């Protein structure tokens, strides 16, 4: 393979340019160990080495692709407007301050006047106004469809004016999706951000700039930008992001001291891998309750998923203890009927937990008319026609093995009570076929994952929606086409305060518990390990880990 090592020389006076990395530099960076790279001068961390299993091929500040895009969930190279703290509360980041009006129709905010783009250009209010107009008009951000004006009120202050109470909705649903300021001099006139693949695509105004990357070695290098110290002094001078083929290899690198911490968005280290790391000196497992979860939804556009009696019976057929062990080892727990885990805002413990009772499931299926008419060991539909459920685990290039194992447990459980089923092999062959299948509702059981980012506000209920509100265009993977469910979902996401959010969130929990339209498969304990021998100031955010927006300002050398 031809070497694809590149270096990005970021000048304060001219736009970003790309030059080949000299061979001596490439050799040094590829063989340098974390022990050598992480030497610190004074109290600063000289170079923090972060491991990931995400690929490093795309470096575009307006996408969420690969390690670069996912690292920017942490206010890394981009000026994210806000971030979520360890308690899941929103805090200012690029915005120096912000307030939401009582009616939820306005956000007032201030910005720094000394921030710079990584090519040396100043960040201005023109960039901020451009950003919101670009997100609304070009990127068609659904949560900004009712944004009527970006009103500049001072040199460093402005207001977002909405015609509907969407302020709370936008800021909460967007904060984990790279809601950041865009460089007008780069993105103006670009209708499709993914088409920009030159070095200028990586320019941001975050606390770090991309210096170089080596796509063969799957490593990238970053340096701090002192002007963009949004939370105070930046204490980590440089960052190296190194990709690994899988979790086992990544954790071996950490045990060997080659990396200091790991970051995989919404993908904590699997329990079986964690068990091999336990007891290793100077490694904190980074344990916390996980707010995300795997879930399954019954396809309700056709029989038998459109029959609540079938869904209730099938629910009792599933071995939740085996699922919990499969997904999270000894740490997994049987989930509740309301889908969302206890670590999520608004969790309703009164709904109780799911139960496994195969005998009860068989009895309920008989009563609902799902009987083995022809004596082949499998039940038919109540009208006597064959029943063979199509099961589709969500496609993933990195965690398909786990999703297939989950599907196997569910399928074996259903098979034991006479429900014939099969995996839709075409749908799990690639992401395009899978998405086309779920979007059309062509499934009987869909297995998906709510990420911790989605769980923080949009919740698992977003995955179950079969209809959006009028005027909104976005992905649809669910088959709940009930007006009350849709209305409660938007009442939750458009709430103007936490009280309204929780009230409507609990209505959604009760809906799925009462209808068994969908169910969680396991409540997990998350592990995001990090080394403790060289640095202090680590903070393990629940469901997120030790790498987040405040890491760059709080981590110091021992």
Listing of model-derived features with the role each one plays in the protein:
Residues 305-306, 318, 334-374, 397-404:
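Structural transition elements
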Residues 215, 372-452, 526:
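Ligand/substrate-recognition segments at binding pockets and active sites
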Residues 134, 226-273, 420-422, 428:
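Ligand-site clamp/hinge motif
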Residues 52-74, 94-96, 121, 165, ...:
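A structural "hinge/loop" feature
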Residues 217, 224, 317-349, 402-411, ...:
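Detector for C-terminal structural segments
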Residues 99, 143-190:
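Surface-exposed binding/hinge segments that line
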Residues 67, 75, 85-89, 177-233, ...:
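Gly/Pro-rich hinge or "lid" segments in bacterial periplasmic/extracellular proteins
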Residues 49-102, 133, 203-204:
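N-terminal lobe/hinge region of extracytoplasmic solute-binding protein
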């Amino acid at each position: 393979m031809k070497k694809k090592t590149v270096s990005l020389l970021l000048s304060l006076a001219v736009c970003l340019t790309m030059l080949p990395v000299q061979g001596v530099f490439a050799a040094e960076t590829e063989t340098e160990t974390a022990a050598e790279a992480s030497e610190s001068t004074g109290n600063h961390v000289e170079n923090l080495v972060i491991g990931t299993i995400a690929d490093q091929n795309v470096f575009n500040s307006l996408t969420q692709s690969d390690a670069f895009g996912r690292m920017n969930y942490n206010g890394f190279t981009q000026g994210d407007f806000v971030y979520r703290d360890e308690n899941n509360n929103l805090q200012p980041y690029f915005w120096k301050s912000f307030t939401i009006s009582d009616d939820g129709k306005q956000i007032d905010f201030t910005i720094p006047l000394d921030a710079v783009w990584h090519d040396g250009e100043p960040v201005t209010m023109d960039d901020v106004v451009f950003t919101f107009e670009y997100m609304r008009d070009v990127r068609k951000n659904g949560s900004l469809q009712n944004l009527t004006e970006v009103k500049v009120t001072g040199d460093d202050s402005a207001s977002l004016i909405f015609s509907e109470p969407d302020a709370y909705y936008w800021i909460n649903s967007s904060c984990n999706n790279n809601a950041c300021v865009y460089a007008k001099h780069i993105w103006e006139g670009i209708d499709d951000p993914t088409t920009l693949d030159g070095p200028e695509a990586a320019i941001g105004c975050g606390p770090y700039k991309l210096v170089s990357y080596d796509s063969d070695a799957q490593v990238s290098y970053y340096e701090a930008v002192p002007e963009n110290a949004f939370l105070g002094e930046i204490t980590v001078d440089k960052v190296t992001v190194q990709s690994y083929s899988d979790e086992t290899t990544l954790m071996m690198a950490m045990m060997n001291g080659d990396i200091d911490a790991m970051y995989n968005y919404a993908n904590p280290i699997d329990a079986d891998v964690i068990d091999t790391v336990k007891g290793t000196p100077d490694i904190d497992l980074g344990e916390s309750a996980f707010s995300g979860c795997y879930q399954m939804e019954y396809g309700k556009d056709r029989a038998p998923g459109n029959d609540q009696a079938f869904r209730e019976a099938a629910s009792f057929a599933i071995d939740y203890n085996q699922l919990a062990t499969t997904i999270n080892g000894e740490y997994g727990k049987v989930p509740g009927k309301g889908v969302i885990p206890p670590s999520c805002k608004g969790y309703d413990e009164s709904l109780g937990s799911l139960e496994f009772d195969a005998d009860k499931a068989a009895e309920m299926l008989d009563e609902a008319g799902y009987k083995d008419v022809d004596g082949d060991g499998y039940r038919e539909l109540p009208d006597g026609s064959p029943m063979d459920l199509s099961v589709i685990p969500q496609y993933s290039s990195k965690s398909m093995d786990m999703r297939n194992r989950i599907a196997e447990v569910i399928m074996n459980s259903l098979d034991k009570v006479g429900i014939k089923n099969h995996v839709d092999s075409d749908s799990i062959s690639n992401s395009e076929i899978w998405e086309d299948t779920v979007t059309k509702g062509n499934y009987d059981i869909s297995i998906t994952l709510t990420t911790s980012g989605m769980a923080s506000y949009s919740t698992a209920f977003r995955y179950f929606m079969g209809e959006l509100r009028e005027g909104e265009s976005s992905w649809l993977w669910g088959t709940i086409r009930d007006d009350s469910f849709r209305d409660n979902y938007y009442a939750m996401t458009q709430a103007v305060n936490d009280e309204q959010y929780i009230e409507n969130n609990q209505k959604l929990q009760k809906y799925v518990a009462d209808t068994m339209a969908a169910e969680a498969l396991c409540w997990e304990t998350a592990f995001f390990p990090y080394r403790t021998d060289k640095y202090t100031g680590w903070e393990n955010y629940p469901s997120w880990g030790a790498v987040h927006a405040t890491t760059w300002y709080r981590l110091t050398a021992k």
